[in-house]
Amino acid sequence: GGGNEGDKEHHYEHSMPSDVEIRVSERMKGFCMELWGSLPDDYAISIRSPGGEVSPVLDFRNGIDKTIYYIFDRTRITLAVVLVEKDAGDPLIFMRFDNPTPGIWTVAVSSSERQMRGNGLYHMWLPIEQFLEQSVTFLSPSPEVTLTEPSNASQVITISGYDSHTDSWYSASGRGYTRNGGIKPDLVAPGVRVPA
């Protein structure tokens, strides 16, 4: 199956430069987030906390991991960078938020170069709902490209759900395409109020 992340507000897609707003609920101990870019672009980010603390612009061209400490918000963000991820062949920035202050966090995504070399497109994902203890969502999410692994693999037949009673898409069902433009899901099947 394609998963149930279509309506969970856990995917964001845009071109840089842009600001990504993330709503973090009360009592969240921590969460992870991934930014997947596309070559040949280089990515830089700055993160603003709900209390207004702003990190310096972090440039990842050198491939060095970084940690940000927010003194007033008492939050730590660890950033690990993979310049070229071995399976996908694209840059990946992995962010781990520990003890995040509730409210709206803003991630400013820009190019580390004066002139972008590619199209500047990037995707960000939060964990699937079952991996989060509290709510974390993008304020301007994209319901597209929300298929869960391994349904993105080209050798896998991916099935998503629709509501056969209304002939409409099941809103929670993961949607394609894949991040690199592959056509998924392969099939849709009734997925709402199906008798046992």
Model regions: which residues?
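Loop-rich non-cytosolic ectodomains and luminal regions
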Residues: 1-196
